[in-house]
Amino acid sequence: MANYKGRGNVMIRSMLLGLYGIINIVCVNGTFINYKDALTKSLIFLEAQRSGKLPPNNRVPWRGDSALDDGKLVNVDLSGGYYDAGDNVKYGLPMAFTITTLAWSTITYEKELRATGELENARAAIRWGTDYFLKCASRKNRLYVQVGDPNADHQCWARPENMKTPRTVLEISDKVPGTEIAAEAAAAFAASSIVFRHVDHKYARRLLNKAKLLFKLAKSHKGTYDGECPFYCSNSGYNDELIWAATWLYKATRNHLYLSYLKFEAISAYVAEFSWDLKYAGAQILITKLIFEGHKGLDLYKQQADSFVCSNLPGSPYHQVFTTPGGMIHLRDGANSQYVTATAFLFSAYADILQKHNQKISCGSHQFDSTHLMAFAKKQIDYILGHNPQGRSYMVGFGPNPPKQAHHRGASVPMHEANAPLSCPLSFVKWYNKNVPNANELTGAILGGPDRQDKFQDLRWTSVYTEPCTYINSIAVGVLAKLAAA
């Protein structure tokens, strides 16, 4: 069903039985939000980010095979995986976080994804990432963490299918530690093993074994890896990734080795954000679920999870995260939408936990229950999908007045011109610096989004507003599934 605008300022819920089951469509201030359509398109965007040999069922007609020789420099097949954003580099840390959060969405909202017909697409998106990471982790005590030269890549504006820039390879090992990425990859493998446990037991077991080995590598050879700087520097250190990985490994194995780590070794912290670089809040909410299920000695994690909510929730006396006049949380310019979708998902997941156990959160003298958390999560998603002062969607190809100039190489270069013999400087003149809509629609991409005053510039060269990222979408999938199937 197409998105369309209606009249009136009341909220109308229309439950329609369509091809894929129940679809929830909401009218907010005259704009109808088709959550099922947004969910479908969110997953299509992830397909647009695929690297390697594309499958026959590829749903993005303007994408083709790319980077088939990745890893050749180190005699390892490193084809596959995802490009993180609008460029053609494969960064291990944000890619692994993309897979972990997509797996979490799929585990938490499996029933809703099945009801909306998107469960298999979500699993396929996860497997595209885990297949790649299995290649990256094919050698003992070593993990390949990046393919491509970001400095060279950023000097050229070319489709991945036609790129000529170097495909250099970076790695971590027991000799060159990189605790953040090793632990994040362990988390991705562990979470994904749960997704495939009852679908492909052999594959799930393989993922879990890799998760255990990588966690051991991360924990035994501690050190921050800065090879991806200045593009994906870990500013938060590695303690959050270690907690995150241990939490997922405990969920996947119920082995008390990982629970013991969380109780006696882990170093946690009070935070107000959840992102590819800062995982504490996600782990704290997962651990809070364990507390409600009867686990002892973990109370600090619940205090920290509650603090995360109190820091973000308007109306809380401890509210500290800036909210725009239009109601969107804003932590910093540059892919701010990642914090919007991440916070929405954590609030949604925590709301489910609170509702199941009939619990509330106390922020000083104020108490909040699951309905408060879910209302805030929904408001953040609705903002992205069109309920905002600009009256426009920030998802490409969806809703009212969606963006046309995503900062994205593949989307902006016309297929029939892609083989033009242009130098890198001229590629920017030809395809980057023109104020025209992209030649190819980057369907489903949630862009960086507006600034602190709800202002947005739909221009390719204003990347802080218009660049998409896989981890913005991956973590939106769960809450979109919940809203679509409500």
Curated annotation (Swiss-Prot):
<keyword id="KW-0732">Signal</keyword>
<comment type="similarity">
    <text>Belongs to the glycosyl hydrolase 9 (cellulase E) family.</text>
</comment>
<dbReference type="Pfam" id="PF00759">
    <property type="entry name" value="Glyco_hydro_9"/>
</dbReference>
<protein>
    <recommendedName>
        <fullName>Endoglucanase 16</fullName>
        <ecNumber>3.2.1.4</ecNumber>
    </recommendedName>
</protein>
<keyword id="KW-0624">Polysaccharide degradation</keyword>
<dbReference type="GO" id="GO:0071555">
    <property type="term" value="P:cell wall organization"/>
</dbReference>
<keyword id="KW-0378">Hydrolase</keyword>
<dbReference type="InterPro" id="IPR008928">
    <property type="entry name" value="6-hairpin_glycosidase_sf"/>
</dbReference>
<dbReference type="InterPro" id="IPR018221">
    <property type="entry name" value="Glyco_hydro_9_His_AS"/>
</dbReference>
<dbReference type="InterPro" id="IPR001701">
    <property type="entry name" value="Glyco_hydro_9"/>
</dbReference>
<keyword id="KW-0136">Cellulose degradation</keyword>
<feature type="glycosylation site" description="N-linked (GlcNAc...) asparagine">
    <location>
        <position position="29"/>
    </location>
</feature>
<feature type="active site">
    <location>
        <position position="458"/>
    </location>
</feature>
<dbReference type="GO" id="GO:0005576">
    <property type="term" value="C:extracellular region"/>
</dbReference>
<feature type="active site">
    <location>
        <position position="407"/>
    </location>
</feature>
<keyword id="KW-0119">Carbohydrate metabolism</keyword>
<keyword id="KW-0325">Glycoprotein</keyword>
<dbReference type="GO" id="GO:0030245">
    <property type="term" value="P:cellulose catabolic process"/>
</dbReference>
<feature type="active site" description="Nucleophile">
    <location>
        <position position="87"/>
    </location>
</feature>
<feature type="active site">
    <location>
        <position position="467"/>
    </location>
</feature>
<keyword id="KW-0964">Secreted</keyword>
<keyword id="KW-0961">Cell wall biogenesis/degradation</keyword>
<dbReference type="InterPro" id="IPR012341">
    <property type="entry name" value="6hp_glycosidase-like_sf"/>
</dbReference>
<dbReference type="GO" id="GO:0008810">
    <property type="term" value="F:cellulase activity"/>
</dbReference>
<feature type="signal peptide">
    <location>
        <begin position="1"/>
        <end position="30"/>
    </location>
</feature>
<keyword id="KW-0326">Glycosidase</keyword>
